[in-house]
Amino acid sequence: MTKRTTIAARRVGLIDLGKATRQTKGLTQIQALDSVSGQFRDQLGLSAD
């Protein structure tokens, strides 16, 4: 993760993976991390490819 991405992630409050995992309790930890990655991409306007 680039420094810029990390700063942007902190700004939108998604850097707390523990919080993200709690919010997606029905998913495995890996799926929760995938979900957070998708949120990062959406927030930063990157493609999902």
UniProtKB/Swiss-Prot annotation:
Pfam families associated with the record: Subterisin
Q: Which InterPro entries match?
A: Lasso_benenodin (IPR049805)
Arranged from A to Z, the UniProt key words for this protein are: Antibiotic, Antimicrobial, Cytoplasm, Isopeptide bond, Secreted
Propeptide residues according to the Swiss-Prot or TrEMBL record: 1-25
Tell me the temperature dependence: Unthreads upon heat treatment.
Crosslink position(s): Isoaspartyl glycine isopeptide (Gly-Asp): G26-D34
Does the UniProt entry include the keyword Cytoplasm? yes
Q: What is known of its domains?
A: Is composed of a ring composed by 9 residues, a 5 residue-loop (SVSGQ) and a C-terminal tail. The peptide is threaded when the C-terminal tail is inserted throught the isopeptide-bonded ring. The loop region serves as a recognition element for the isopeptidase AtxE2.
| Protein name (Swiss-Prot/TrEMBL) | Astexin-2
Species, as recorded = Asticcacaulis excentricus (strain ATCC 15261 / DSM 4724 / KCTC 12464 / NCIMB 9791 / VKM B-1370 / CB 48)
Provide the organism lineage as a comma list.
Bacteria, Pseudomonadati, Pseudomonadota, Alphaproteobacteria, Caulobacterales
